[in-house]
Amino acid sequence: MIDAHIHLDQYEETLLSSLLQSLPEQDIESLIAVSMNLASSLRTQGIAARYPGLVRPAYGFHPEQPLPPEEDLAALLDWITLHARDMAAIGEIGLPYYSRAEAIEHGEAWDMEPYTRLLDRLLGLAARLAKPVVLHAVYEDAWTVCDLLEQHHITRAHFHWFKGPGDTVDRMISRGYYISFTPDILYEQEIQDLARRYPPELVMAETDGPWPFEGPFTGRTTHPAMVHDVAAAWGALHGYTGSEAKAILTANTVRFYGL
């Protein structure tokens, strides 16, 4: 199988080495390794160079962090352009739903416009480079992101760990956008309902590691092999056998990322 979304650069080095070396025996053939910013992209690039074919890097700027100074953003965009041939996608990019929600909860002012402009620039780069995008866009933010994707004529969009209302789900399905499920599909009703609704041909499996999970994964280090659990849970919702579910999710990921 393929873990369609993981932050390898956030694992401690010794753990990372053992994790990556264990993948063949865990029946994991590849990982889509996303990045947070330029420093993160450089680390992801280094990991991918040590594990060619196994680690497929994506470079970008994660929205749930302070906005970069213009010179830093320009450096990132130039660097991504320079290394476009080496990357599977631009990501992780999107809008800061959780940061905004926290600020509002604490009565703090929040201006979304700079984040929307940043995403617009990153999507423009993806369009120019003809690369797919890995998106952090949930709930009402996903509708805005759909608007931007259409403005840039981007069709290869992967909404990772997606959550959102029915009208947005319908819009995403109509545009052929992909989503991916994490191990929380085993214990979150909201996610299970979405999994039943979203077309099987537009779905992938991910871990978002090293993000920790609850339920049967409480206290465990997040490992790419958990995508097997995701496949089993997702397949059960659709009446697939375990092997059928794994084959479908893997084929979808290969097709989307052109692996």
Language model regions located:
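Mid-domain alpha/beta scaffold segments of enzyme catalytic cores
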Residues: 1-259
